[in-house]
């Protein structure tokens, strides 16, 4: 009798140990597995949504230069700032449309038009004209209106130039009239017309400082910046001559 009871108790215990102890042992398709899958998917979706929201709240860091340039384009300029403008240069123009050179491309005029902030200026600059008398320039140059985002100021520091100016709900672009060399060596020996047997020569740009509208902190301010204004010939005497 005792042996029979011992056998029944042992069989009962083996049956209990063989029973599933967690949802991990539940067959696929059972309610426990479905709930677990749904919970896991919900947690994954919630995690992705949280990560996406976190990225929106904390965007990737941007370069300081890019942020400053974007700020410069959105700043609204007080018209009184132009009344305080001094040392006005004909090489700086604020306009809503790209300025054009004259037809012969040898001079430039600032016309009185309502799309320009330089209405009181009318200037003309020569671009090394070649006359019909057999005259030639020592160096060949080219002039054009350009825009700038950075420049070197009179102290040698790199500053941010305002490319776009928002004035009275109208966006003006700041243009600069620059002159550059077409080629440092217009002829194989260097500058044109230089005696290469006694002199070394080459063409290079020279610059000048003009007043331009720049960014200083979060405010617009006038500052002297450097631009190229001419192409000249540099000569050095050859040694042994």
Curated annotation (Swiss-Prot):
Q: Which GO terms describe its cellular component?
A: axon; dendrite; extracellular space; synaptic vesicle
Q: Which residues form the propeptide?
A: 19-125
Q: Which InterPro entries match?
A: Cystine-knot_cytokine, Nerve_growth_factor-like, Nerve_growth_factor-rel, Nerve_growth_factor_bsu, Nerve_growth_factor_CS, Venom_nerve_growth_factor
Extract one GO BP annotation from the record.
negative regulation of neuron apoptotic process
Q: What is its main location?
A: secreted
Molecular function (GO) terms for this protein are: growth factor activity; lipid binding; metalloendopeptidase inhibitor activity; nerve growth factor receptor binding; toxin activity
Per UniProt, subunit arrangement is: Homodimer; non-covalently linked.
Briefly state the protein's biological role.
Nerve growth factor is important for the development and maintenance of the sympathetic and sensory nervous systems. It stimulates division and differentiation of sympathetic and embryonic sensory neurons as well as basal forebrain cholinergic neurons in the brain. Its relevance in the snake venom is not clear. However, it has been shown to inhibit metalloproteinase-dependent proteolysis of platelet glycoprotein Ib alpha, suggesting a metalloproteinase inhibition to prevent metalloprotease autodigestion and/or protection against prey proteases.
Its protein name is: Venom nerve growth factor 2
Q: Which organism is it from?
A: Naja sputatrix (Malayan spitting cobra)
């Amino acid at each position: 009798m005792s042996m029979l009871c011992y056998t029944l108790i042992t069989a009962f215990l083996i049956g209990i140990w063989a029973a599933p102890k967690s949802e991990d042992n539940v067959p696929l398709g059972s309610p426990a597995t479905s709930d677990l899958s749904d919970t896991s998917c919900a947690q994954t979706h919630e995690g992705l949504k949280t990560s996406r929201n976190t990225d929106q709240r904390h965007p990737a860091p941007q370069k300081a230069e890019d942020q400053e340039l974007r700020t410069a384009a959105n700043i609204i300029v007080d018209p009184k700032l132009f009344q305080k403008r001094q040392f006005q240069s004909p090489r700086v123009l604020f306009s809503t449309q790209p300025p054009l050179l004259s037809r012969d491309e040898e001079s430039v005029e600032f016309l009185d038009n309502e799309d320009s902030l330089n209405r009181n200026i009318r200037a003309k600059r020569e671009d090394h004209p070649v006359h019909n008398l057999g005259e030639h320039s020592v160096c060949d140059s080219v002039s054009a209106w350009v825009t700038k985002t950075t420049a070197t100021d009179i102290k040698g520091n790199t500053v941010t130039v305002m490319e776009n100016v928002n004035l009275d709900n109208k966006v003006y672009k700041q243009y600069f009239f620059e002159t550059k060399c077409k080629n440092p060596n217009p002829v194989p020996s260097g500058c044109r017309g230089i005696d290469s047997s006694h002199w070394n020569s080459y063409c290079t740009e020279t610059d000048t400082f003009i007043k331009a509208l720049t960014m200083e902190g979060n405010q617009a301010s006038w500052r002297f910046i450097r631009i190229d204004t001419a192409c000249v010939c540099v000569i050095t005497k050859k040694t042994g001559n």
